[in-house]
Amino acid sequence: MNQTFSFNFDDTLSNSSGLINLEKINQNCSPNYQYFKIKFIGGYLHIKNKSGDILEKYDLKDLISLIALKKDYLKLSSPNNKKPNEFTNIKNKHLENRFNLYVINEDINGKITKNGILEEIILNRLLLSILLGNEENLLQIA
């Protein structure tokens, strides 16, 4: 089963918002980890300079990523004070990676990373920024 969430990411040099579809997938790589496929339904990633001017704009529609995190996240309680179905980052806040979340592949279908490693780094940062601190939202995915 999968579920759709909105996401919002904003920091000094980039911002992004849109919709993602999260699907729990069965991988037997490690029994201690849960794997998720993330498909961007819509949204853009903007790269900005220090003045806030947009230097580059990436269409995220149909981009597919794969992540993993320790199953310890299942011990979390469901969100009660956050807007449901939304992944947001907190600007300039250090986020702890409590469940060893990592991005296995930023762009499975090579939609925007075909140009080089810079796009991979930016996507990795985007994914970690919207997921870290929002792990309880993953409890909603059966």
Curated annotation (Swiss-Prot):
Induction: The toxin locus has divergently transcribed operons maximally expressed during early stationary phase. This is part of the orfX1-orfX2-orfX3 operon. A longer botR-orfX1-orfX2-orfX3 operon is also transcribed at lower levels. Keywords: Lipid-binding, Virulence. Disulfide bonds: none annotated. One of its GO terms (molecular function) is lipid binding. It comes from the Bacteria. OrfX1 was not detected as part of a crude toxin extract that includes BoNTA2/NTNH, P47, OrfX2 and OrfX3. Part of a botulinum neurotoxin type A2 (BoNT) locus; may be part of a progenitor toxin complex required to protect BoNT during its passage through the host gastrointestinal tract. Binds phosphatidylinositol (3,4) bisphosphate, phosphatidylethanolamine and phosphatidylserine. Belongs to the TULIP P47 family. This is Protein OrfX1. It comes from Clostridium botulinum (strain Kyoto / Type A2). The gene is orfX1.
